[in-house]
């Protein structure tokens, strides 16, 4: 009922950007099922001022991105193009300046989607990113990649919609949906090069936040309940994180399950923040860890714990407001 009521607002806003986004190959207008599924989550952002439940929004974003119609969002696929189209429209509806960073890797064309919010007098940047490509269809089976990493993209969208006036010295915000995670993390490298081409060098980036696999509670760290969140690289900001966690009561961990080796691997080698770390940029990677569903056909939207997921996103939102 709520979504049906929102559809006129979506249709009005969609006309503003559909022509601009014609570069994306998939034509959602010709596929009524995909068009309906596409409109539902985007409609939640189309009417400014309408309050809607955070948990329900996250469910809607993940359900669309991990749905059968997008077939796992493999880089260069029609499903990936549909996801890119959706994300760019979402950013535009949120009032962000949208840029598309196109790159090639392993014979595929990738697209990083950037949503930028600049503030007068600000000369430093905070980059918030999540990879949106998945494994796609392998051996005739679809790998939905809901937790890894439709969940991170859902968190990214929610944070991008919270355009706020920073506390203290203002910083510009760049929200990035990265392509190419499953093709050598090529989107992260392409992003570094693209930002440099725009005059945004490592010295002007105050922080990079990577949202990578955010929605599960199946593998809590030792001594924690299911209400946990892992923040690799966050130890030096433990006080501000503790303050932002007031009332949310998440169990925050600053290492990967107590293992120094795995912490170094996940923080420095197996996700896109590694490209920025190599340049000396401070980074935090938020994750809920790998589960038995990761990189399997069972990584579906139904396996996520949305009440806890919503609290994680709210925590990151509060923490970012302190920048």
Regions found by a protein language model. Give the residues of each.
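Second-shell loop/turn segments in exported
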Residues: 43-52, 68-78, 103, 140-149, ...
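His/Asp/Glu-rich mid-to-C-terminal helical/loop segments that flank catalytic regions of hydrolases
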Residues: 24-26, 291-323
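Alpha-helical metal-binding/catalytic segments enriched in His/Glu/Asp
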Residues: 115, 128-134, 138-185, 316
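A non-catalytic alpha/beta surface segment that caps or lines the substrate-entry region
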Residues: 60-64, 72-118
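Metal-dependent peptidase/peptidase-like ectodomains
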Residues: 168, 178-283
């Amino acid at each position: 009922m709520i979504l049906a009521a929102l559809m006129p607002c979506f249709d009005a806003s969609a006309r503003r950007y559909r022509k601009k986004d014609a570069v994306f190959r998939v034509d959602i207008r010709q596929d009524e099922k995909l068009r309906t599924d596409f409109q539902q989550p985007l409609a939640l952002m189309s009417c400014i001022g309408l309050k809607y439940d955070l948990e329900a929004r996250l469910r809607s974003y993940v359900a669309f991105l991990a749905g059968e119609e997008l077939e796992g969002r493999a880089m260069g696929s029609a499903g990936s193009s549909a996801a890119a189209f959706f994300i760019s429209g979402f950013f535009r509806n949120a009032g962000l300046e949208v840029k598309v960073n196109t790159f090639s890797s392993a014979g595929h064309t990738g697209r990083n989607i950037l949503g930028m919010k600049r503030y007068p007098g600000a000369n430093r940047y905070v980059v918030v990113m999540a990879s949106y490509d998945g494994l796609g269809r392998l051996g005739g089976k679809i790998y939905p990649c809901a937790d890894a990493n439709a969940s991170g993209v859902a968190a990214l969208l929610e944070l991008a919609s919270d355009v706020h006036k920073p506390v203290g010295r203002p910083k510009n915000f760049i929200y990035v949906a990265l392509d190419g995670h499953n093709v050598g993390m090529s989107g992260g490298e392409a992003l570094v090069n693209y930002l440099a081409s725009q005059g945004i060098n490592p010295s002007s980036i105050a922080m990079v936040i990577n949202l990578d696999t955010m929605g599960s509670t199946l593998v809590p760290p030792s001594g924690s309940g299911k209400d946990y969140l892992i923040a690799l690289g966050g130890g030096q900001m433990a006080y501000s994180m503790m303050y932002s966690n007031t009332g949310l009561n998440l169990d925050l961990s600053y290492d990967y399950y107590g293992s120094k080796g795995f912490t170094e691997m996940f923080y420095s080698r197996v996700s896109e923040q590694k490209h920025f770390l190599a340049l000396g940029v401070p980074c935090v990677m938020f994750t809920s860890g790998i589960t038995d569903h990761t990189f399997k056909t069972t990584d579906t939207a139904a396996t996520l714990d949305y009440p806890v997921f919503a609290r994680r996103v709210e925590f990151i939102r509060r923490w970012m407001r302190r920048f």
